[in-house]
Amino acid sequence: MAQLTNNDEKYRDLLFEILAHGLITDPEVKRSLAKFFIFVGDGGNGKGTLLSIIRSILNRENCSGLKIKQMSDERYAYSLDGKLVNLGDDIQDQPINGKDMEMLKNISTCDYVEIRKMFKNSTSAAMTTSLIFTSNHILKSWEKGESYKRRVLWLPMYSKPKRKDPRFITKLTTQKALEYWLRLIIEGYKRLYENGDFTN
């Protein structure tokens, strides 16, 4: 985590709060926070590694992997229902259109969205899924208002490891390591409830 945050203690706290955000299933609490998250930076700096670690901590069954453009399709959106987090890796460098932006905002505020299981009629659902994405670029939006800026948390990741370890993820997801991660995430969870906001 020191590598990912450049040894910035407040940034480290923020990252654990973001992971803790995925454990919050109370719509009122999630609505009050009203955020989605985009890790941004060029390749080889650990963005994909972080998503792999999150999947290991929260269990793959609790995670989906939709891109932003897929989410506004009610057939894909169905896969978000009941998940703790959506982990969308390597989002394309294209402006977010109005339809996709509406979906991002609705899910981040636990508003009702339309979802549809294959061969079934669509239905409305309010989801508490946390939305976490990675991108090599700052994504623009067609939206002219301020609500996009209020909803998104940009998380820069520009430092690269000096030496690559092929077993890095395995080492960080042992049972002992996962227990350590979980303890720090719980601390972040408590901070979110106590402060009602993320660490600046």
Language-model segments: residues:
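Feature primarily recognizes SF3-like P-loop helicase cores of small DNA viruses
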Residues: M1-N200
